[in-house]
């Protein structure tokens, strides 16, 4: 029935058109802190759309279920590429211009690599090269 449509849209990543990665228009130093990729049951209204709406050094970043002002983390060696290869992605994203949750491997915790996923770039466990 019609009651299933919002769930289907959420599953396809369409329900949050405002979900733009804060780093795209960022001019403040540092990077948004890494976040756990978990399924959100209820998205909160965005608290900001750009870094300049945030006080002091805070950046406008995606959090688990919202976009809000968070303290930046230092970009430790942005050119370092971690070992391993990104897993092969099958399928096509239904969302136009999906947000990237990382840009470089150094923004990912531990051994995780910044890889292309079905919808945007995310931190993933690499496969052996």
UniProtKB/Swiss-Prot annotation:
Residues in the signal sequence: 1-22
Tissue: Found in pregnant endometrium and myometrium, placenta, allantoic fluids, fetal cord blood, and fetal liver. Also found in uterus and lung.
A GO molecular-function descriptor: serine-type endopeptidase inhibitor activity
Cysteine pairs bridged by disulfides in the record: 32-61, 40-65, 48-60, 54-69, 86-115, 93-119, 102-114, 108-123
Complex formation: Interacts with GRN; interaction protects progranulin from proteolysis.
PANTHER family given in the database record: ANTILEUKOPROTEINASE (PTHR19441:SF44), WHEY ACDIC PROTEIN WAP (PTHR19441)
Described purpose of this protein according to its UniProt entry: Acid-stable proteinase inhibitor with strong affinities for trypsin, chymotrypsin, elastase, and cathepsin G. Modulates the inflammatory and immune responses after bacterial infection, and after infection by the intracellular parasite L.major. Down-regulates responses to bacterial lipopolysaccharide (LPS). Plays a role in regulating the activation of NF-kappa-B and inflammatory responses. Has antimicrobial activity against mycobacteria, but not against salmonella. Contributes to normal resistance against infection by M.tuberculosis. Required for normal resistance to infection by L.major.
Record protein name field: Antileukoproteinase
Biological classification of the source: Eukaryota, Metazoa, Chordata, Craniata, Vertebrata
Gene behind this protein: SLPI
